[in-house]
UniProtKB/Swiss-Prot annotation:
A divalent metal cation binds at residues 446, 451. Residues 433-499 are annotated as: Inter-domain linker. Interacts with sigma-54. Residues 514-533 bind DNA. Disulfide bonds: none annotated. Residues 29-170 form the GAF domain. GO terms for molecular function: ATP binding; ATP hydrolysis activity; DNA-binding transcription factor activity; metal ion binding; sequence-specific DNA binding. Residues 203-432 form the Sigma-54 factor interaction domain. The keyword Flavoprotein does not apply. SUPFAM superfamilies: GAF domain-like, Homeodomain-like, P-loop containing nucleoside triphosphate hydrolases. It comes from Herbaspirillum seropedicae. This is Nif-specific regulatory protein. The lineage of its organism: Bacteria, Pseudomonadati, Pseudomonadota, Betaproteobacteria, Burkholderiales.
Length: 542
């Protein structure tokens, strides 16, 4: 008879462990998982009261899941280490068996009466929950009377095995939760860094054309409107797109970029909309598209003028309905995405030729911003050159590299078909290949007929913009900050004549922002910094 009971107990243990193992590996919802585990234990052990307590950051054991408790009993399930039977199990890290709770002085009766309503004895079995030698909590079972079908030793053994499985799951869950929290914090820090990197204050452009671009960006960024950025390749459309995102209410959401020209029609559809498992050869699992990934943020479609007419129709539907289906799927997915597009093509001509759908053109051309080519804002070139030289110095840990006036004249007279991107490459290439710390005109590839721009575009007759020395700044600059009388006349006074006073005046007018004061004085930020040091002018902090 004992052998039969032992066999039944072993079979019960195997079945119970198997079912609980499946539950623990089926979900990342810890609360739901633990509840299902306790339900299995309650059914297999034929008991109505099962409790699971875990150690909290407060240093207390707290009930996190239970079967057979009232709300009041559940809320009272808190124990200090060593307090009551539960606290004692945690403290000693050993199981405790109580055959009659009415006779046990350690029992506090917070989660169970000492006797059943009909006076029947209530017994108790509790085991510690451990993982990698770390105490995590306590698993307890209450029973009215004694079980006729199994011994207490069998129950202790079963509960210990279950507690070990629970401990491993809890430890893994907490590890994943900690990593997720760390990733979220890193994401927030990266987002703050990107916001600083791509804010408009860091976009170089003192020219009137770029100031107009900045004004349009500030005006349109807070809205939900679809935007179209237009300009030649290399003018900085992506930088402006990111600035729009980080100036908008969606700045804490994702910024997702897709280069439409780099993907075929089939790949572009899968990339934007995602795909279901088995949608095509090689689709081993479902995959979210860029529209889903950009939910709550901004989707930047670069080179939108290069997409095929067939795909234009699919994109139009998404823009109209704000929903789509994954490739190979039938379920509609709704998204909240702000769309920013960019192109270097003449879309109006493309529409006239039938190469671009007119209805899609009207959808994306809600707010249009034109980014001027570098040759139309040559006054920005000295500041861009200085910025790229400083970037090169920091990235390569080099000494300060300067550019001679003759070298700057070459830069100012270049056609720059590749715009800012080409300018940056030219500065980096020249600074890398030169010897010494001063770039002269002989260091440039174009002076050796090794530059494609020199071959394709002969220098024009445009006069370079002269950087006015500080001492030559005269009264008209005072009008930049002067009060206006509404008739187009400045009423403010001209800046002071002394160089030190002029520096202080410019800094005061610009709120002690060095970059703004430098632009007002038509000098570079580096020159501004040198001048402030030279005259021992302390920069005020606000």
């Amino acid at each position: 008879m004992a052998t039969i009971l032992d066999d039944r107990s072993v079979n019960l243990e195997l079945v119970t462990i198997y079912e609980i193992s499946k539950i623990l590996g089926s979900s990342l919802d810890l609360s739901k998982t633990l509840r299902e585990v306790l339900n299995v234990l309650s059914a297999h052990l034929e008991t109505k009261r099962v409790l699971l307590s875990l150690m909290q950051d407060s240093g207390e054991l707290q009930l996190v899941s239970a079967i057979g408790l009232s709300y009041e009993e559940f809320q009272s399930g808190r124990y200090r280490v060593g307090e009551g039977i539960t606290g004692k199990i945690f403290q000693t890290e050993t199981p405790i068996v109580v055959r009659d709770l009415a006779q046990e002085p350690l029992f506090l009766a917070r989660t169970s009466p000492r006797q059943s309503q009909d006076g029947e004895v209530i017994s108790f079995v509790g085991v510690p929950i451990k993982a990698a030698r770390e105490m995590l909590g306590v698993l307890c079972v209450f029973r009215d009377g004694q079980s006729p079908s199994r011994s207490v030793d069998h129950e202790v053994r079963l509960l210990t095995m279950v507690a070990n499985l629970i401990g491993q799951t809890v430890r893994l869950y907490r590890s994943v939760a900690a990593e997720r929290q760390q990733l979220q914090e890193e994401k927030r820090q990266l987002s703050r860094q990107l916001q600083g990197k791509y804010k408009l204050d860091n976009v170089i452009g003192i020219s009137k054309a770029m100031q107009e671009v900045f004004a349009q960006v500030h005006q349109s960024a807070p809205s939900r409107s679809t935007m179209l950025l237009r300009g030649e390749s290399g003018t900085g459309k992506e930088v402006i797109a990111r600035a729009i995102h980080y100036l908008s209410p969606r700045k804490d959401g994702p910024f997702i970029k897709v280069n439409c020209a780099a993907l075929s029609e089939t790949l572009l559809e899968s990339e934007l909309f995602g795909h279901e498992k088995g949608a095509f050869t090689g689709a081993q699992g479902e995959r979210k598209g860029r529209f889903e990934l950009a939910h709550g943020g901004t989707l930047f479609l670069d080179e939108i003028g290069e997409i095929s007419p067939a795909f234009q129709a699919k994109l139009l539907r998404v823009l109209q309905e704000r929903e789509f289906e994954r490739v190979g799927g039938s379920r509609s997915i709704k998204v909240d995405v702000r769309l920013v597009t960019a192109t270097n093509r003449d879309l109006e001509k493309a529409v006239a030729k039938g190469e671009f759908r007119a209805d899609l053109y009207y959808r994306i051309n809600v707010v249009s911003i034109f980014i001027p080519p570098l040759r139309e804002r040559r006054e920005d070139i000295p500041y861009l050159v200085e910025h790229f030289l400083e970037k090169f110095r920091v990235e390569n840990q080099r000494a300060m590299v300067a550019m001679s006036p003759q070298a700057m004249k070459v830069m100012m007279n270049c056609y720059w078909p590749g715009n800012v991107r080409e300018l940056e490459n030219c500065v980096e290439r020249t600074a890398t290949m030169m010897r010494g710390d001063l770039i002269t005109e002989v260091h440039f590839s174009c002076q050796q007929n090794k530059c494609l721009t020199k071959v394709l575009h002969e220098p024009g007759q445009q006069q370079p913009v002269v950087v006015v020395p500080l001492e030559r700044i005269s009264a008209p600059y005072g009008a930049i900050f002067a009060e206006w009388d509404g008739q187009g006349q400045a009423t403010g006074a001209a800046p002071p004549t002394s160089e030190r006073e002029r520096l202080i005046w410019a800094m005061e007018q610009c709120g002690w922002v060095q970059a703004k004061a430098a632009r007002a004085l038509n000098i570079s930020p580096r020159q501004m910094g040198y001048a402030l040091q030279k005259f021992n002018i302390e920069v005020k902090k606000f």
